[in-house]
Amino acid sequence: MKRFMLVSVLTVSALASQAALANPDLAKAKNCMACHAVSTKLVGPAFKDVAAKYAGQKDAEAKLAAKVMKGGSGTWGAIPMPANPQVSDAEAHTLVKWVLAQK
């Protein structure tokens, strides 16, 4: 039984690690990194700044996922974020969870 539990814990840990590593790759694949970086403001805000601004907000994930897909303006300055029709709802939520985890 102990062996089964150990294998289960290791499997879950490995899958979680792979998912965490995949999110920067997804951000690159969906062209997020053309305007954003983790720590530095480019055209759009740094992901760490987004995470800080929305920390603790219950609706942050849904609000940001909608902005990823539909675009938005006025939150971070004069340059609007364009819509991203190439990003699915599931991908938007995956990306936003990763962005909100940046600290």
List each language-model region with its residue ranges.
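Axial heme c-ligation environment in periplasmic c-type cytochrome domains
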Residues: 34, 42-54, 67-96
